[in-house]
């Protein structure tokens, strides 16, 4: 089972409402408004963490919601900000917006972070709305709703080095010899059904991560078997180590195997085919005809590969020299972020003031989260508050949309339980 993609719902917190309150102190006449601002809602933030290698955790939890901001208080007390929700993901996680299908971010390095849902802004308290002619505003600003979206997570970077080759050529054995990884090893095809990772440490050099990529078969680039899943796992490795079974004990032809694997790489992605590649002839401990290796080496040289490493992963013969070469080449290959064409990048849209208008039995019904929160912060029995309410409806385009829909003088408009007659 491949746990390299996951779809989750993220929702940031709503902003707290501004407070409506007035100073009430002895000997202080007409103390004035002192309602505090609401706190901002918490955001949902993804963070790349080197300690994670799969998206397995997201199969058990699909919804992530940050805290709401608290409402403002009297005496100009600000509401508490909602706690941000941090979600750890593996390095190399690519995040896409489900609705648009566009890439939001590529978390390519340790500690990279991205806000996938920004918390709603807290509303202003009534003290902000005091003017020389409106000294006691009996209204406040509502907090704004948070963002909610479905996102796709996809791992496109599992390791610095990818071990590639047909099934059962010794990739898992090699990984177990050079790291502390303990992959399942057996003598049958598709032993490895998901990438096994191992950290390879060599004295005097930086450690690197090596992945035993599941065996590729013919037609992998066209989706045969688990081919596309396999190829996706090596798309972001910096260096490929191509392992072939030089012994031929299973009746395989190492030259044909080598060509077929490279053909699948090329069909899937030319960039992947151009990736630096170290050729490894494994199982020399079972090789009974040295001429087989020499013939293989000559054919590989013709294809543009100057050197072939001759090893036995089982006995560790030649493995140390191979790892030194891998380390040397990695030191010259920069870690690059995946290029995202500008037109494919996700651009968040402003959806804070969403509402709908419908006509029901001659009544214009305005609905939406913004309308709900606005009504909670308006005193419909106060003239100043109603004037502010009218101003908000005008500024947000609701009144203009009602006119475009053909509303007439004295037609009824309903917002939740509040109704009023429209005047042109």
Swiss-Prot record:
Q: Where is the OCT domain?
A: 345-424
**Residues covered by the OBG-type G domain:** 159-331
Report the cofactors.
Answer: Mg(2+)
In this chain the Obg domain maps to 1-158
Top-rank taxon: Bacteria
**GO molecular function (one):** GTP binding
Q: Where in the cell is it found?
A: Cytoplasm
> What InterPro entries is this protein classified in?
G_OBG (IPR031167), GTP-bd (IPR006073), GTP-bd_Obg/CgtA (IPR014100), GTP-bd_prot_GTP1/OBG_C_sf (IPR036346), GTP1-OBG_CS (IPR006074), GTP1_OBG_dom (IPR006169), GTP1_OBG_dom_sf (IPR036726), OBG_GTPase (IPR045086)
Q: Name one GO cellular component term.
A: cytoplasm
**Xref: Pfam families:** DUF1967, GTP1_OBG, MMR_HSR1
Q: Which UniProt keywords apply?
A: Cytoplasm, GTP-binding, Hydrolase, Magnesium, Metal-binding, Nucleotide-binding
Q: What is its EC number?
A: 3.6.5.-
Principal localization reads: cytoplasm
Residues at which Mg(2+) binds = 172, 192
Q: What does this protein do?
A: An essential GTPase which binds GTP, GDP and possibly (p)ppGpp with moderate affinity, with high nucleotide exchange rates and a fairly low GTP hydrolysis rate. Plays a role in control of the cell cycle, stress response, ribosome biogenesis and in those bacteria that undergo differentiation, in morphogenesis control.
Oligomeric and partner information: Monomer.
Q: What is this protein called?
A: GTPase Obg
What species was this sequence derived from? Clostridium novyi (strain NT)
């Amino acid at each position: 089972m491949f746990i390299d993609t996951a779809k989750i719902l993220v929702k940031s917190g709503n902003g707290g409402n501004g407070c409506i309150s007035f100073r009430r102190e002895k000997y202080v006449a007409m103390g004035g408004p002192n309602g505090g601002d609401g706190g901002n809602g918490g955001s949902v933030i993804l963070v790349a963490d080197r300690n994670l290698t799969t998206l397995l955790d997201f199969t058990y939890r699909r919804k992530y919601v940050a805290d709401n901001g608290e409402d403002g208080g009297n005496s100009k007390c600000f509401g508490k900000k909602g706690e941000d929700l941090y979600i750890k993901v593996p390095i190399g996680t690519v995040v896409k917006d489900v609705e648009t299908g566009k890439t939001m971010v590529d978390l390519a390095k340790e500690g990279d972070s991205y806000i996938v849902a920004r918390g709603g802004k807290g509303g202003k308290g009534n003290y902000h709305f005091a003017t020389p002619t409106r000294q006691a505003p009996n209204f406040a600003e509502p907090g704004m709703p948070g963002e909610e979206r479905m996102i796709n997570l996809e791992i496109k970077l599992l390791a610095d080095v990818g071990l590639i080759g047909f099934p059962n050529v010794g990739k898992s054995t090699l990984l177990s010899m050079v790291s502390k990884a303990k992959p399942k090893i057996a003598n049958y095809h598709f032993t490895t059904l998901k990438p096994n990772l191992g950290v390879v440490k060599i004295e005097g050099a930086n450690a690197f991560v090596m992945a035993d990529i599941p065996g590729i078969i013919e037609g992998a680039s066209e989706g045969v078997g688990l081919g596309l899943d396999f190829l996706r796992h090596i798309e972001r490795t910096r260096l490929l180590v191509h392992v072939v079974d030089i012994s031929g004990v299973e009746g395989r032809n190492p030259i044909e195997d080598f060509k077929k694997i490279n053909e699948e790489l090329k069909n899937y992605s030319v960039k992947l085919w151009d990736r630096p590649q170290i050729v490894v002839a494994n199982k020399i401990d079972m090789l009974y005809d040295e001429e087989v290796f020499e013939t293989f080496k000559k054919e590989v040289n013709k294809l543009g590969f100057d050197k072939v490493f001759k090893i036995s992963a089982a006995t560790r013969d030649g493995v140390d020299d191979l790892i030194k070469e891998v380390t040397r080449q990695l030191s010259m290959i920069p870690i690059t972020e995946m290029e995202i064409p500008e037109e494919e990048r996700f651009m968040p849209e402003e959806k804070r003031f969403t509402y709908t208008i419908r006509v029901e039995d001659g009544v214009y019904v305005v609905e939406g989260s913004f309308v709900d929160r606005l009504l909670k912060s308006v005193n419909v029995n106060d003239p100043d508050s109603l004037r502010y309410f009218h101003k908000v409806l005008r500024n947000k385009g609701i009144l203009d949309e009602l006119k475009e829909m053909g509303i007439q003088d004295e037609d009824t408009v309903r917002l939740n339980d509040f109704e009023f007659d429209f005047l042109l």
